[in-house]
Swiss-Prot record:
Origin species: Haloarcula marismortui (strain ATCC 43049 / DSM 3752 / JCM 8966 / VKM B-1809) (Halobacterium marismortui)
Keyword list, A-Z: ATP-binding, Cytoplasm, Glycolysis, Kinase, Nucleotide-binding, Transferase
Subcellular location: Cytoplasm
Similarity annotation: Belongs to the phosphoglycerate kinase family.
UniProt superkingdom: Archaea
Transferase in keyword set: yes
Gene that specifies this protein: pgk
Residues that bind ATP: 330, 356-359
GO cellular component: cytosol
Protein name as catalogued: Phosphoglycerate kinase
Amino acid sequence: MTFQTLDDLDDGQRVLVRLDLNSPVEDGTVQDNRRFDRHAETVSELVDRGFEVAVLAHQGRPGRDDFVSLAQHAEILADHIDHDVDFVDETYGPQAIHDIADLDGGDVLVLENTRMCDDELPEEDPEVKSQTEFVQTLKDEFDAYINDAYSAAHRSHASLVGFPLVMDAYAGRVMETEYEANTAIAEKEFDGQVTMVVGGTKATDVIDVMTHLDEKVDDFLLGGIAGELFLRAAGYPVGYDIDDANLYDEQWEENSEKIESMLEDHRDQITLAVDLAYEDDGDRAEQAVDDIEEKSVSYLDVGSETVMEYSPVIRDSEAVFVKGALGMFEDERFSVGTAGVLEAIADTDCFSVVGGGDTSRAIEMYGMEEDEFGHVSIAGGAYIRALTGAELVGVEVLQR
């Protein structure tokens, strides 16, 4: 790790802090989640050390229902740090500049959604982003820039990559811990068995992860939609798209050759589900994959026998990495797979990193604690890229 951290920053300065507070929004209401918990550590430390703090963050994308103001985020953050947090409905307009100038030591000000700025979203080179009006207007108002948004570090957006080229830049505590944990699989050497639980909805993510880690990982335990696509490649009639959802057929057409090739080349490393769960008259029902005769049911989870097969593999591992959920865990009926493997990991002393998609949410939903795992990542896309060894531009600019 070659970037500067908060340990290298003198107390009491005025700092611009990029967080990732992007959250689920239901009926216009921002939902509290673990990202606020995590980033509260960084913000609370800055407050305690007398910094004047202005926060940058994004929410949703233009045109979507979750594209809302950060006013609610400021209130939620205040609850998490048990400290007053102000909000201004501009990102770098005259009122924002005025409120920034009025900051005193220990004050926290949340600026408006960065994605409401025209300069923010286009993916462009960091050098281009550093010259935008957004960056050039704010850079002289602060002593330093802190990026704590590891989960957005794969995006070349102005608030993430522009400021480090024109200001002293540091990594926040979330950036620091996520980077160390999520690069461990690429850098750490293990003497014993390394297992990866791979689920989720995107076949391309699974293919990329397995391709890059086939020499590091001894066993891939598959589930989710991606796992069903591998079952289809093995000859099972699964992957039924309900209500024209196009979760399976489109991905199969795009990735079938890669999946079939991977299954053929690495069959001894890949463990597939032996049974699957579906809804039957409102209840959970399970079926052995060997008994499936036609593609006519939408499967929503791996079955209990699969969890029983996966659990001993996990218990015998020195290290376990998790990418994505094994089923539709938000519905308790179909949480058996995801909750089952997470409980198996929690019951061991292995080195573990859990991340990807909503997996961290499953830990909270089913009564587990984060400290039962080595590290629980709040990152999605950045986690996948870290696993595959891809460069994270938001990290790279901090290391310059």
